Protein backbone atom coordinates (compact mmCIF):
# COMPACT_ATOMS: atom_id res chain seq x y z
CA UNK A 1 0.00 0.00 0.00
CA UNK A 2 1.23 3.51 -0.77
CA UNK A 3 2.00 5.71 2.19
CA UNK A 4 -1.36 7.12 3.38
CA UNK A 5 0.39 10.46 3.98
CA UNK A 6 1.31 10.79 0.31
CA UNK A 7 0.32 14.22 -1.05
CA UNK A 8 -2.09 12.80 -3.64
CA UNK A 9 -3.89 10.76 -0.99
CA UNK A 10 -4.11 13.73 1.37
CA UNK A 11 -5.49 15.87 -1.44
CA UNK A 12 -8.27 13.37 -2.18
CA UNK A 13 -9.06 12.86 1.49
CA UNK A 14 -9.14 16.61 2.03
CA UNK A 15 -11.63 17.05 -0.79
CA UNK A 16 -13.92 14.46 0.79
CA UNK A 17 -13.69 16.26 4.15
CA UNK A 18 -15.51 19.18 2.52
CA UNK A 19 -18.52 16.91 1.89
CA UNK A 20 -19.17 16.33 5.60
CA UNK A 21 -22.68 17.19 6.73
CA UNK A 22 -24.05 16.90 3.21
CA UNK A 23 -26.45 14.82 1.12
CA UNK A 24 -25.67 13.21 -2.25
CA UNK A 25 -28.70 12.18 -4.34
CA UNK A 26 -29.11 9.63 -7.13
CA UNK A 27 -30.40 11.20 -10.36
CA UNK A 28 -31.20 10.03 -13.89
CA UNK A 29 -31.70 13.33 -15.69
CA UNK A 30 -30.85 17.03 -15.81
CA UNK A 31 -34.28 17.81 -14.35
CA UNK A 32 -33.66 15.58 -11.33
CA UNK A 33 -30.15 16.98 -10.89
CA UNK A 34 -31.55 20.50 -10.78
CA UNK A 35 -34.12 19.45 -8.17
CA UNK A 36 -31.30 18.01 -6.05
CA UNK A 37 -29.23 21.18 -6.41
CA UNK A 38 -32.17 23.44 -5.51
CA UNK A 39 -32.86 21.28 -2.45
CA UNK A 40 -29.35 21.87 -1.14
CA UNK A 41 -27.63 18.60 -2.05
CA UNK A 42 -23.82 18.77 -2.16
CA UNK A 43 -23.70 16.35 -5.08
CA UNK A 44 -25.56 14.06 -7.46
CA UNK A 45 -24.84 10.45 -8.40
CA UNK A 46 -25.65 9.98 -12.09
CA UNK A 47 -27.25 6.63 -13.01
CA UNK A 48 -29.07 5.05 -15.93
CA UNK A 49 -31.54 3.58 -13.44
CA UNK A 50 -32.06 4.28 -9.75
CA UNK A 51 -31.47 1.30 -7.40
CA UNK A 52 -35.16 0.37 -7.04
CA UNK A 53 -35.33 -0.04 -10.83
CA UNK A 54 -32.08 -2.00 -10.96
CA UNK A 55 -33.46 -4.47 -8.43
CA UNK A 56 -36.42 -5.25 -10.67
CA UNK A 57 -34.56 -5.53 -13.98
CA UNK A 58 -32.85 -8.52 -15.52
CA UNK A 59 -29.55 -8.13 -17.30
CA UNK A 60 -26.20 -6.51 -16.59
CA UNK A 61 -26.11 -3.16 -14.76
CA UNK A 62 -23.18 -1.13 -16.09
CA UNK A 63 -21.74 2.35 -15.61
CA UNK A 64 -23.78 5.27 -16.96
CA UNK A 65 -23.45 6.59 -20.52
CA UNK A 66 -20.71 9.27 -20.29
CA UNK A 67 -22.82 11.66 -22.37
CA UNK A 68 -25.42 11.79 -19.59
CA UNK A 69 -22.73 12.65 -17.04
CA UNK A 70 -21.36 15.35 -19.33
CA UNK A 71 -24.83 16.82 -19.86
CA UNK A 72 -25.53 17.01 -16.13
CA UNK A 73 -22.07 18.46 -15.39
CA UNK A 74 -22.90 21.37 -17.69
CA UNK A 75 -26.22 22.09 -15.97
CA UNK A 76 -25.40 22.04 -12.24
CA UNK A 77 -22.70 23.62 -10.11
CA UNK A 78 -22.62 20.95 -7.39
CA UNK A 79 -20.43 17.83 -7.37
CA UNK A 80 -21.18 15.15 -9.96
CA UNK A 81 -20.46 11.49 -9.19
CA UNK A 82 -21.05 8.22 -11.02
CA UNK A 83 -20.80 4.50 -10.31
CA UNK A 84 -18.56 1.87 -11.88
CA UNK A 85 -18.72 -1.89 -11.54
CA UNK A 86 -16.51 -3.50 -8.90
CA UNK A 87 -13.13 -4.19 -10.49
CA UNK A 88 -13.88 -2.40 -13.78
CA UNK A 89 -10.91 -0.04 -13.93
CA UNK A 90 -11.62 0.95 -17.56
CA UNK A 91 -15.07 2.31 -16.66
CA UNK A 92 -13.24 4.31 -13.99
CA UNK A 93 -10.66 5.56 -16.52
CA UNK A 94 -13.48 6.82 -18.75
CA UNK A 95 -15.14 8.70 -15.88
CA UNK A 96 -11.83 10.21 -14.81
CA UNK A 97 -11.30 11.47 -18.37
CA UNK A 98 -14.65 13.27 -17.97
CA UNK A 99 -13.16 15.03 -14.93
CA UNK A 100 -15.94 13.72 -12.73
CA UNK A 101 -15.74 14.74 -9.05
CA UNK A 102 -15.90 11.26 -7.50
CA UNK A 103 -16.25 7.63 -8.57
CA UNK A 104 -18.29 5.04 -6.66
CA UNK A 105 -16.99 1.47 -7.07
CA UNK A 106 -20.40 0.04 -6.42
CA UNK A 107 -21.96 -3.30 -5.54
CA UNK A 108 -25.27 -1.89 -6.85
CA UNK A 109 -24.00 -2.56 -10.39
CA UNK A 110 -23.10 -6.00 -11.73
CA UNK A 111 -19.66 -7.13 -10.54
CA UNK A 112 -17.04 -7.05 -13.31
CA UNK A 113 -14.10 -8.75 -11.57
CA UNK A 114 -14.64 -11.42 -8.91
CA UNK A 115 -10.96 -11.45 -7.93
CA UNK A 116 -10.00 -7.79 -7.57
CA UNK A 117 -11.27 -4.37 -6.68
CA UNK A 118 -9.89 -1.40 -8.61
CA UNK A 119 -6.46 -0.12 -7.55
CA UNK A 120 -7.72 3.32 -6.68
CA UNK A 121 -4.22 4.67 -5.99
CA UNK A 122 -3.72 4.83 -9.77
CA UNK A 123 -6.41 7.51 -10.13
CA UNK A 124 -6.41 11.22 -9.40
CA UNK A 125 -10.18 11.13 -8.88
CA UNK A 126 -11.31 10.20 -5.34
CA UNK A 127 -13.27 6.97 -4.91
CA UNK A 128 -16.04 5.98 -2.51
CA UNK A 129 -16.63 2.30 -1.69
CA UNK A 130 -19.21 0.42 0.35
CA UNK A 131 -18.63 -1.66 3.46
CA UNK A 132 -20.52 -3.80 5.92
CA UNK A 133 -17.84 -4.06 8.61
CA UNK A 134 -14.54 -2.56 9.74
CA UNK A 135 -12.26 -5.03 7.97
CA UNK A 136 -13.99 -4.41 4.68
CA UNK A 137 -13.79 -0.63 5.15
CA UNK A 138 -10.06 -0.70 5.91
CA UNK A 139 -9.31 -2.97 2.94
CA UNK A 140 -11.06 -0.52 0.62
CA UNK A 141 -9.10 2.36 2.17
CA UNK A 142 -5.85 0.43 1.69
CA UNK A 143 -6.74 0.13 -2.01
CA UNK A 144 -7.11 3.90 -2.20
CA UNK A 145 -10.73 4.68 -1.30
CA UNK A 146 -11.03 8.27 -0.06
CA UNK A 147 -14.54 7.82 1.35
CA UNK A 148 -16.49 4.90 2.78
CA UNK A 149 -20.24 4.36 2.83
CA UNK A 150 -22.46 1.64 4.22
CA UNK A 151 -23.72 -0.81 1.63
CA UNK A 152 -27.18 -0.99 3.14
CA UNK A 153 -29.86 -2.47 0.90
CA UNK A 154 -30.14 -0.08 -2.03
CA UNK A 155 -33.49 0.37 -3.71
CA UNK A 156 -35.63 -0.94 -0.84
CA UNK A 157 -36.41 2.21 1.11
CA UNK A 158 -35.67 0.01 4.14
CA UNK A 159 -33.01 1.36 6.50
CA UNK A 160 -32.42 -1.88 8.44
CA UNK A 161 -29.30 -3.04 6.57
CA UNK A 162 -27.65 0.39 6.64
CA UNK A 163 -28.22 0.64 10.39
CA UNK A 164 -26.79 -2.86 10.84
CA UNK A 165 -23.64 -1.88 8.96
CA UNK A 166 -23.27 1.42 10.83
CA UNK A 167 -23.59 -0.30 14.20
CA UNK A 168 -21.25 -3.13 13.16
CA UNK A 169 -18.45 -0.71 12.24
CA UNK A 170 -19.07 1.42 15.34
CA UNK A 171 -19.01 -1.62 17.64
CA UNK A 172 -15.85 -3.00 16.05
CA UNK A 173 -14.08 0.35 16.48
CA UNK A 174 -15.22 0.51 20.10
CA UNK A 175 -13.85 -3.00 20.66
CA UNK A 176 -10.58 -2.10 18.90
CA UNK A 177 -10.11 0.89 21.19
CA UNK A 178 -10.36 -1.40 24.23
CA UNK A 179 -7.47 -3.62 23.10
CA UNK A 180 -3.87 -3.53 24.26
CA UNK A 181 -1.15 -2.93 21.67
CA UNK A 182 -0.32 -6.63 21.45
CA UNK A 183 -3.98 -7.54 21.00
CA UNK A 184 -4.36 -5.04 18.14
CA UNK A 185 -2.04 -7.07 15.90
CA UNK A 186 -4.13 -10.20 16.41
CA UNK A 187 -7.31 -8.19 15.73
CA UNK A 188 -5.85 -6.80 12.48
CA UNK A 189 -5.07 -10.33 11.32
CA UNK A 190 -8.52 -11.54 12.33
CA UNK A 191 -10.33 -8.88 10.26
CA UNK A 192 -7.77 -9.14 7.43
CA UNK A 193 -6.92 -5.44 7.52
CA UNK A 194 -3.57 -3.59 7.22
CA UNK A 195 -2.04 -3.01 10.66
CA UNK A 196 -1.15 0.64 9.95
CA UNK A 197 -4.79 1.47 9.20
CA UNK A 198 -5.98 -0.51 12.21
CA UNK A 199 -3.60 1.43 14.47
CA UNK A 200 -4.69 4.73 12.90
CA UNK A 201 -8.35 3.84 13.43
CA UNK A 202 -7.65 3.09 17.09
CA UNK A 203 -5.84 6.41 17.48
CA UNK A 204 -8.64 8.40 15.81
CA UNK A 205 -11.44 6.32 17.38
CA UNK A 206 -13.19 6.40 13.99
CA UNK A 207 -12.53 5.48 10.36
CA UNK A 208 -9.60 7.47 8.95
CA UNK A 209 -11.73 8.72 6.04
CA UNK A 210 -15.14 10.36 5.64
CA UNK A 211 -17.97 7.87 6.24
CA UNK A 212 -21.45 8.29 4.72
CA UNK A 213 -24.64 6.27 5.21
CA UNK A 214 -26.25 4.70 2.14
CA UNK A 215 -28.74 2.03 1.17
CA UNK A 216 -32.38 2.36 2.18
CA UNK A 217 -32.53 5.99 3.34
CA UNK A 218 -36.07 7.12 2.42
CA UNK A 219 -37.22 9.77 4.93
CA UNK A 220 -35.82 12.72 6.91
CA UNK A 221 -36.04 10.54 10.03
CA UNK A 222 -33.92 7.83 8.37
CA UNK A 223 -31.27 10.38 7.44
CA UNK A 224 -31.20 11.95 10.91
CA UNK A 225 -30.94 8.54 12.57
CA UNK A 226 -27.84 7.74 10.51
CA UNK A 227 -26.30 11.08 11.46
CA UNK A 228 -27.04 10.56 15.16
CA UNK A 229 -25.22 7.22 14.92
CA UNK A 230 -22.09 9.06 13.83
CA UNK A 231 -22.23 9.24 10.04
CA UNK A 232 -20.60 12.19 8.27
CA UNK A 233 -23.34 12.52 5.65
CA UNK A 234 -25.90 10.59 3.62
CA UNK A 235 -26.39 9.15 0.14
CA UNK A 236 -30.05 8.98 -0.89
CA UNK A 237 -31.06 6.84 -3.86
CA UNK A 238 -34.60 5.85 -4.73
CA UNK A 239 -36.05 7.59 -1.67
CA UNK A 240 -36.24 10.98 -3.39
CA UNK A 241 -37.66 10.38 -6.84
CA UNK A 242 -39.84 7.41 -5.86
CA UNK A 243 -41.65 9.59 -3.32
CA UNK A 244 -44.88 11.48 -4.00
CA UNK A 245 -43.25 14.92 -3.75
CA UNK A 246 -39.55 14.68 -4.76
CA UNK A 247 -38.83 18.41 -4.38
CA UNK A 248 -40.16 18.55 -0.84
CA UNK A 249 -38.64 15.21 0.16
CA UNK A 250 -35.22 16.25 -1.14
CA UNK A 251 -35.24 19.56 0.74
CA UNK A 252 -36.53 17.89 3.92
CA UNK A 253 -33.78 15.25 3.93
CA UNK A 254 -31.11 17.93 3.43
CA UNK A 255 -32.56 19.89 6.35
CA UNK A 256 -32.74 16.76 8.51
CA UNK A 257 -29.06 16.02 7.92
CA UNK A 258 -28.09 19.60 8.80
CA UNK A 259 -30.26 19.57 11.94
CA UNK A 260 -30.11 15.91 12.93
CA UNK A 261 -29.98 16.63 16.67
CA UNK A 262 -32.91 19.06 16.73
CA UNK A 263 -36.24 17.19 17.18
CA UNK A 264 -38.25 20.39 16.68
CA UNK A 265 -36.80 20.95 13.21
CA UNK A 266 -37.02 17.24 12.42
CA UNK A 267 -40.74 17.33 13.26
CA UNK A 268 -41.24 20.36 11.05
CA UNK A 269 -39.45 18.91 8.01
CA UNK A 270 -41.29 15.58 8.38
CA UNK A 271 -44.75 17.16 8.08
CA UNK A 272 -46.89 16.95 4.93
CA UNK A 273 -44.29 15.31 2.71
CA UNK A 274 -46.76 13.14 0.86
CA UNK A 275 -46.22 9.41 0.47
CA UNK A 276 -42.66 8.12 0.83
CA UNK A 277 -41.43 5.46 -1.60
CA UNK A 278 -43.32 2.20 -1.13
CA UNK A 279 -40.18 0.24 -0.32
CA UNK A 280 -39.56 -3.43 0.30
CA UNK A 281 -38.61 -5.66 3.21
CA UNK A 282 -37.11 -8.21 0.84
CA UNK A 283 -33.33 -8.55 1.00
CA UNK A 284 -31.93 -9.47 -2.42
CA UNK A 285 -30.42 -12.94 -2.69
CA UNK A 286 -27.35 -11.38 -4.30
CA UNK A 287 -26.47 -9.54 -1.07
CA UNK A 288 -28.25 -11.68 1.53
CA UNK A 289 -24.94 -12.63 3.16
CA UNK A 290 -22.96 -9.49 2.42
CA UNK A 291 -22.15 -8.92 6.09
CA UNK A 292 -19.47 -11.52 5.36
CA UNK A 293 -17.58 -10.04 2.45
CA UNK A 294 -16.62 -12.52 -0.26
CA UNK A 295 -13.08 -13.68 0.47
CA UNK A 296 -12.14 -13.20 -3.18
CA UNK A 297 -12.27 -9.43 -2.75
CA UNK A 298 -8.96 -8.95 -1.03
CA UNK A 299 -6.54 -7.27 -3.43
CA UNK A 300 -6.63 -4.47 -6.01
CA UNK A 301 -5.61 -4.97 -9.62
Swiss-Prot record:
Subcellular localization, as worded in the UniProt entry: Cytoplasm
Catalysed conversion reaction: aldehydo-D-ribose 5-phosphate + D-glyceraldehyde 3-phosphate + L-glutamine = pyridoxal 5'-phosphate + L-glutamate + phosphate + 3 H2O + H(+)
Active-site residues, as the UniProt record annotates them: 83 (schiff-base intermediate with d-ribose 5-phosphate)
GO cellular component: cytosol
Binding residues for D-glyceraldehyde 3-phosphate: 167
One of the GO biological process terms: amino acid metabolic process
Subunit-level organization: Homohexamer and homododecamer. In the presence of Pdx2, forms a dodecamer of heterodimers.
Described function: Catalyzes the formation of pyridoxal 5'-phosphate from ribose 5-phosphate (RBP), glyceraldehyde 3-phosphate (G3P) and ammonia. The ammonia is provided by Pdx2. Can also use ribulose 5-phosphate and dihydroxyacetone phosphate as substrates, resulting from enzyme-catalyzed isomerization of RBP and G3P, respectively.
Family: Belongs to the PdxS/SNZ family.
Name recorded for this polypeptide: Pyridoxal 5'-phosphate synthase subunit Pdx1
Record organism: Plasmodium falciparum (isolate 3D7)
Amino acid sequence: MENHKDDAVLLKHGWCEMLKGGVIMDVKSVEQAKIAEEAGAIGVMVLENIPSELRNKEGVARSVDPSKVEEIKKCVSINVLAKVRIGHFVEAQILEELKIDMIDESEVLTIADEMHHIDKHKFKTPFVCGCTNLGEALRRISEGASMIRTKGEAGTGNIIEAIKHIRTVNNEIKYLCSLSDSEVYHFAKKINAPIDLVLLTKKLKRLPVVNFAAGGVATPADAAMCMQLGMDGVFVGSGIFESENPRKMAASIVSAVSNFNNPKILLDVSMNLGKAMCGSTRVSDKWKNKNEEHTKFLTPQ
